[in-house]
UniProtKB/Swiss-Prot annotation:
It comes from Desulfotalea psychrophila (strain LSv54 / DSM 12343). This is 4-hydroxy-3-methylbut-2-en-1-yl diphosphate synthase (flavodoxin). The keyword 4Fe-4S applies. The lineage of its organism: Bacteria, Pseudomonadati, Thermodesulfobacteriota, Desulfobulbia, Desulfobulbales. SUPFAM superfamilies: Dihydropteroate synthetase-like, Nitrite and sulphite reductase 4Fe-4S domain-like. InterPro entries: Dihydropteroate_synth-like_sf, IspG_bac, IspG_bac-typ, NO2/SO3_Rdtase_4Fe4S_sf. It catalyses: (2E)-4-hydroxy-3-methylbut-2-enyl diphosphate + oxidized [flavodoxin] + H2O + 2 H(+) = 2-C-methyl-D-erythritol 2,4-cyclic diphosphate + reduced [flavodoxin]. The gene is ispG. [4Fe-4S] cluster binds at C268, C271, C303, E310. Converts 2C-methyl-D-erythritol 2,4-cyclodiphosphate (ME-2,4cPP) into 1-hydroxy-2-methyl-2-(E)-butenyl 4-diphosphate. Disulfide bonds: none annotated. Binds 1 [4Fe-4S] cluster.
Length: 364
């Protein structure tokens, strides 16, 4: 059982972050925020995938104003991502953003940052101090050098400097992120930061890459930190559809026993005994379980000889052979089905399990 680090708790809309609240999953839209229809559609898909909090880029006043319509169309808290222009932060808050993400060091000085803090206080909203290895102040780079796995001081000091600036103006509804594209720099940086602050931490590896590289890098870095009890909210950054970020995030949390959403799908890697198109079968089953909420374990195996035994912990599973497949529950044979009907019958069984869960869960 993982023991979470004790942190303060802040409220991002309806989602609590830090304290004893669950580790929340975030993503960021990749649409033009000013395109309300496309952005709202993406927010809806993110929420359906389980996303707790979404961030949108605010490039100008039109984007800030668009937040008002987006908030009306989505019950998910929306964070405004701000760079350089403090007026955009204020406008985003006025238009219903649940929080803002800034790097106070690039807002144009303390006077402008103070105006942002005053607006956040007035609206009762938190601020994320988000520092990336590529946005560190020049004097800190000169003093400490560029962040590496063995030297994360510039990242940490940049974050703490900006936190102190907010605190100076009486503001403490803060969460912090210090992101690098390097796994060990990210890990070591957050480990050191967690020792010197009790503000909630937003975990992430920036510019992680595509589906495979990004998933591996983020899972290694964030998995280490989460297993040490570090981290209150997270984003898996991928050069993909943002919905994939949410799916990877929940799979990571599931693997660590931190949080579960929907079914867990296990499948064998195939071998010479496989006599069916397991790749296609597993892909089609995965598409269905992604829309389910029942916290069950589903197995897709390629061999009727070893499949049920190897996946006996699964609540329900499927294994194929030559012309004949089987459906098993907890390793015990449940049905024999002709191969051409195997997928159809199995999906019907999955939908029945989901209906049972929904009836029980919703007290229907």
């Amino acid at each position: 059982m993982i023991s979470r680090r004790s942190t303060r708790q802040i409220q991002v809309g309806r989602v609590a972050v830090g304290g004893d609240s669950p580790v929340s999953v975030q993503s960021m839209t990749n649409t033009d925020t000013r395109d309300i229809e496309k952005t709202a559609e993406q927010l809806q898909r993110l929420q359906q995938a389980g996303c707790d909090i979404a961030r949108v880029a605010v490039l100008d006043q039109d984007a800030a104003r668009a937040i008002s319509a987006l908030v009306d169309m989505s019950s998910m808290p929306i964070i405004a991502d701000i760079h350089f222009d403090y007026r955009l932060a204020i406008a985003a808050m006025e238009n219903g953003a649940a929080a803002i993400r800034i790097n106070p060091g690039n807002l144009g000085g303390e006077e402008k940052t103070a105006k942002v803090v005053a607006a956040a206080k007035m609206h009762g909203l938190p601020i994320r101090v988000g520092v990336n290895s590529g946005s560190i102040e020049k004097d800190l780079l000169k003093k400490y050098g560029y962040p590496t796995a063995d030297n994360t001081q510039a990242l940490i000091e940049s974050a703490l400097r900006n936190v102190r600036l907010l605190e100076k103006h009486g503001f403490e509804q803060i969460k912090i992120s210090i992101k690098s594209s390097d796994v060990l720099t990210t890990v070591n940086g957050y480990q050191q930061l967690s020792k010197v602050t009790d503000y909630p931490l937003h975990l992430g590896v920036t510019e992680a890459g595509g589906l495979i590289a990004g998933t591996v890098k983020s899972s290694v870095a964030l998995g280490i930190l989460l297993n040490q009890g570090i981290g209150d909210t997270l984003r898996i950054s991928l050069t993909r559809d943002p919905v994939e970020e949410v799916r990877v995030a929940f799979e990571l949390l599931r693997c660590l026993g931190i949080r579960q959403r929907g079914p867990e799908l296990i499948s064998c890697p195939t071998c010479g005994r496989t006599r069916i198109d397991l790749f296609s079968l597993a892909e089609k089953v995965e598409q269905v379980v992604q829309a389910m909420e029942a916290p069950i374990k589903v197995a897709v195996m390629g061999c009727v000889v070893n499949g049920p035994g190897e996946a006996k912990e699964a609540d329900i599973g499927i294994a194929g052979g030559e012309g004949l497949g089987i459906i098993f529950k907890k390793g015990v044979l449940y049905k024999k089905v002709a191969e051409e009907q195997l997928l159809e019958v199995f999906l019907a069984e999955l939908r029945e399990l989901e209906e049972e869960y929904q009836k029980k869960h919703n007290n229907v």
